[in-house]
Swiss-Prot record:
One of its GO terms (biological process) is mitochondrial electron transport, cytochrome c to oxygen. The keyword Membrane applies. It comes from Pongo pygmaeus. Component of the cytochrome c oxidase, the last enzyme in the mitochondrial electron transport chain which drives oxidative phosphorylation. The respiratory chain contains 3 multisubunit complexes succinate dehydrogenase (complex II, CII), ubiquinol-cytochrome c oxidoreductase (cytochrome b-c1 complex, complex III, CIII) and cytochrome c oxidase (complex IV, CIV), that cooperate to transfer electrons derived from NADH and succinate to molecular oxygen, creating an electrochemical gradient over the inner membrane that drives transmembrane transport and the ATP synthase. This is Cytochrome c oxidase subunit 7C, mitochondrial. Residues 61-63 are mitochondrial intermembrane. Residues 17-33 are mitochondrial matrix. The lineage of its organism: Eukaryota, Metazoa, Chordata, Craniata, Vertebrata. Pathway: Energy metabolism; oxidative phosphorylation. The modification N6-succinyllysine is found at K25.
């Protein structure tokens, strides 16, 4: 009896918590505008690529 009520409760919770599905719907940013996505990706990957060079430049200018 208790097992059936627990099973009924968990399946109803899963059924009520429905999210949008499809490509790009599970990402924390919008992929609708390709130019905005391009700018965000360039900023993200560009900063990761440039950081070691900026650190080396800072260290060389320090001495």
């Amino acid at each position: 009896m208790l097992g059936q009520s627990i099973r009924r409760f968990t399946t109803s919770v899963v059924r009520r918590s429905h999210y949008e599905e499809g490509p790009g719907k599970n990402l924390p940013f919008s992929v609708e505008n390709k130019w905005s996505l391009l700018a965000k990706m360039c900023l993200y990957f560009g900063s990761a690529f440039a950081t070691p060079f900026l650190i080396v430049r800072h260290q060389l200018l320090k001495t």
